[in-house]
Amino acid sequence: MRKLIFLLFCVYLVSCSPSNNAILYESVAIPEAGWTIDNPVRFTVEIVDTTQPYDIYITVRHNTDYEWMNLFLFMKTYYPDLEFSRDTLECFLADETGRWFGRGSSSVRDHVMLLQRNVRFPQKGRYQFEFVHGMRTENLRNIMDLGMKIVPSR
């Protein structure tokens, strides 16, 4: 009986998780050979409610052999009417002493960073987000995954 109660409690916790109401929660694996500038990472989401505000997060997973304390990303947002906007993001992964931010153990670190809060998408339809790294190397090594999460604002 205790096992059943524990199992039901776990199911309840998972169902209350903020990830369950995400309209986008996706991660793309970066090849072990590295992330080249000509290989953008793309995420697509369908927006049906333009009155709902959303919070947008970027997730980064890297190993501790990553050479820099930050990660620059160039982001293009394609709107349903095929217009687009550009933005440059700087993700801080470590402090100036080299101590990694984020969570993880051993040689892998996970970062969840708020990109924008209370965003209202101006048009209904399909949006595409495209990311290219903006680091000073053609082939960026030791970034393992790049992800995006869009959830209704609370």
Regions found by a protein language model. Name each.
Residues 12-15:
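C-terminal motif of bacterial Sec signal peptides marking the signal peptidase cleavage site
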Residues 17-20:
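Bacterial signal peptide processing site
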Residues 42, 91-93, 101-115, 131:
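A beta-strand/beta-hairpin structural motif
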Residues 50-58, 119-135:
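Noncatalytic modules at the cell exterior or secretory-pathway interfaces
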Residues 62-65, 109-112, 118-120, 133-143:
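Short acidic/polar inter-strand loop motif in beta-rich domains
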Residues 73-78, 136-154:
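Exposed low-complexity, polar/acidic, P/S/T/G-rich flexible segments that act as propeptides
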